[in-house]
Amino acid sequence: MAEQNDSNGNYDDGEEITEPEQLRKLFIGGLDYRTTDDGLKAHFEKWGNIVDVVVMKDPKTKRSRGFGFITYSQSYMIDNAQNARPHKIDGRTVEPKRAVPRQEIDSPNAGATVKKLFVGGLRDDHDEECLREYFKDFGQIVSVNIVSDKDTGKKRGFAFIEFDDYDPVDKIILQKTHSIKNKTLDVKKAIAKQDMDRQGGGGGRGGPRAGGRGGQGDRGQGGGGWGGQNRQNGGGNWGGAGGGGGFGNSGGNFGGGQGGGSGGWNQQGGSGGGPWNNQGGGNGGWNGGGGGGYGGGNSNGSWGGNGGGGGGGGGFGNEYQQSYGGGPQRNSNFGNNRPAPYSQGGGGGGFNKGNQGGGQGFAGNNYNTGGGGQGGNMGGGNRRY
């Protein structure tokens, strides 16, 4: 007879657990606000023995944040659950994804959802057949492309493998070590260059150490969502500069800070130049200088600025993303020493009209300042996810 072993109502039937937790944990996004721990467990226990389950809640309101985690006793149970997609709980289709290990949270592409795999470290004797033979166990392969020099035809030592689903790629990355013909290979998620630029890495929507779409905060709060970490007086793309940031930071309009440094898409002034036709010393591109675009405002950020969380405030809701600087994990603040993916906080919702602003933006006073609170967009707080 199974015995209850923790406050979340999780059970342990004495089954020996030998695999790392990272291989047995599943992130569940897009949960209905009515879904409880018991409801989540009741659905997913059809595919295996669940040893831990939690629906993440706002610590103040106790309202569901729209996502949770389940941990199975064996990794193959994750495969069973993923093979049974789509999953519908309380009338809502949810989005399960293998949880990203805590130590990889800082990696900008760790939580990216992609179907293509980069395989490096290949020798000349590694051909398409051996790659297919090895990786077919993870999922259905669509194509294998071993890259060769256009002029000489010589193999360049790497290849791209595309699957019909994102889950095989996530599973391969979690396994860490892969060897073919006694050669250890370097496997990574294949991210298009333009997507890497958006997620951090020296360009749009982020910069060095930006962590992708908000280096230090959760799409907002502290450092600038959709922008860089401490990108003050520097010139950030899509947010960051001068402490402000887009999508729900205290100040900043979809890019651009309150002052000091300039960035793209509606800078308020300051030194340096940014993209989209910004000019140093004051005016930013796309209706800069004073009022902010997409809703104007001198210091209040459109799309849910001034501390309020755009797109649903502190509640995570259905608009979660995992590809920004880490992906799904929980923090120890929620009990049981579990790492957490998105920080708490909240307050205020985006897309709310306000009386502040009146700049030259696309809509004057519309879409300004999403209510009070210190939480950032999509979950406030001051932790990296």
Curated annotation (Swiss-Prot):
InterPro entries: Nucleotide-bd_a/b_plait_sf, RBD_domain_sf, RRM_dom. The keyword Cytoplasm applies. SUPFAM superfamilies: RNA-binding domain, RBD (SSF54928). Residues 199-289, 305-317, 344-362, 369-385 have a biased composition (Gly residues). Keywords: Cytoplasm, Nucleus, Repeat, Ribonucleoprotein, RNA-binding. Residues 24-101, 115-192 form the RRM domain. It is found in: Nucleus; Cytoplasm. PROSITE patterns: RRM. Residues 192-289, 305-385 are annotated as: Disordered. GO terms for biological process: compound eye morphogenesis; female gonad development; mitotic cell cycle; positive regulation of mRNA splicing, via spliceosome; regulation of alternative mRNA splicing, via spliceosome; response to heat; response to starvation. It comes from the Eukaryota. This protein is a component of ribonucleosomes. Could be needed to organize a concentration gradient of a dorsalizing morphogen (Dm) originating in the germinal vesicle. PANTHER family: HETEROGENEOUS NUCLEAR RIBONUCLEOPROTEIN A1, HOMOLOGOUS TO DROSOPHILA SQD (SQUID) PROTEIN. This is Heterogeneous nuclear ribonucleoprotein 87F. It comes from Drosophila melanogaster. The lineage of its organism: Eukaryota, Metazoa, Ecdysozoa, Arthropoda, Hexapoda.
